[in-house]
């Protein structure tokens, strides 16, 4: 679920079935009611994960917790996977004629190597306001 949505542990523990829905554009999104800093946001579900997400909530009441208990596993690596996949999807949508890929990490990261609109979308989906956090912690290999 984290790889598909990028949610933090605390956000997962508060997530209700009714917080997962089809966006007006047809994409499945997760409405984070109280994210980092008490902020609300929408996290898009990555393409290909929709059937598993919908199966997880099917037939359950909207007020039910999606995850009554969580395993003790570290989630940051899964959030990084989500961020990188969302970046690639967003960059590919912005420029369908060119194949999006993460720039190689050799030495210092250069912002010019990235699609900044896609980076901003990743930042919003993860609940960050600063794209430098995304560059430093999520888009590196």
Where are these regions (language model features)?
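A structural signal for short, well-ordered beta-strand segments and their strand-loop junctions
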Residues: 11-14, 66-67, 134
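A short, glycine-centered helix-capping/turn motif at helix boundaries
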Residues: 1-14, 85, 89-94, 116, ...
